[in-house]
Amino acid sequence: MLLELSHVSKIYGDLHALDDLSLEVPRGQWLSVVGSSGSGKTTLMNIVACMDTPTKGSVRLDGRELGSLNAAQLTDIRKNVIGLVFQQFHLIGHLTAVENVMVAQYYHSMTDEKEALEALENVGLADRADHLPSQLSGGEQQRVCIARALINHPEIVLADEPTGNLDETNEQLVLDIFSRLHEQGTTLIVVTHDSHVASCGQRQILLNHGRLVGEKLSEGDEGRRTSTMLDFDDKPPGADGGGTTGAEIKSADEADPLGEPEPKEQR
């Protein structure tokens, strides 16, 4: 098992951003994480990325108990095990695409322009290597970010709303890259409000008020996926209280995060 969370809580005063969450992610799985704003998705990603620590519970990543590691060891995991992709591009404006990828190489104490160029080629941007971010479309900028995240050949890629700022065409280009990574055995955890993006994962989980309240598996059949809902009605105490239930959670433009994806309008 690549990732194991056991009874993890993250508490800020009276707020339980994560509330007794247990989760296992096998090596090579594509996991989609959905839920309304404030459900704990980003907190979960920060803890898995070694950028935050749980108040209670334990997290094991790649066989190591994160709570027992010192700062240098956590930095080593961030450098060598994890690749991060965010909704915001965070590219350095005065550096070219290939130089932005090489920034990650500096973090790994090595620079190799040839490898950085190969990373851009792998995301379809070989002909944009010398372009500044201002000369790239939003989709191209996001693909530079993906190339940068993959430069350390991570075992797990964490993507927080990676297509949130993209139109349908560029969204599909990013999803195609993720599909290739998945086929190569890379573990993916993707936070999204988009039901189409979520449906690309092998498995979807639904968070509500920091708790896991729904799960859905997808089985590939010659490129087509059929889905089975698991334990969706087995909600923890409080999920049916004053807040919304798992079945009722809605994003801004999707009626059912774990339902069938609706056709997406061109943006």
Please provide the spans of the model-predicted regions:
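Compositionally biased regions
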Residues: H7, V33, G38-G40, G138, ...
